[in-house]
């Protein structure tokens, strides 16, 4: 299964987690303790919708 890895600042962590839980997306989340970046691993199909939601919320993100 293809996965998307999205990285963003930790201040958006709760908003992104709320979106993932409310839409029943299986995800894995980790936080880099040195930079404060959050990495979210989601299936490719759900990742496209997540990217659209991040754009809607104006969350700056990077694809890894």
Per-range role (PLM):
Residues 1-2, 23, 61:
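Short, intrinsically disordered low-complexity segments
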Residues 3, 14, 43-45:
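Generic signature of intrinsically disordered, low-complexity, basic-rich segments
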Residues 7-26:
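Short amphipathic alpha-helix segments
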Residues 21-47:
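Acidic, low-complexity, intrinsically disordered interaction modules
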């Amino acid at each position: 299964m293809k996965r998307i890895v999205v990285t963003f600042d930790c201040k958006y962590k709760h908003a992104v987690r709320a979106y993932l839980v409310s839409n029943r997306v299986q995800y894995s989340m980790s936080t880099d303790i040195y930079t404060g970046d959050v990495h979210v691993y989601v299936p490719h199909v759900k990742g496209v919708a997540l990217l659209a939601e991040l754009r809607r919320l104006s969350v700056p993100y990077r694809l890894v």
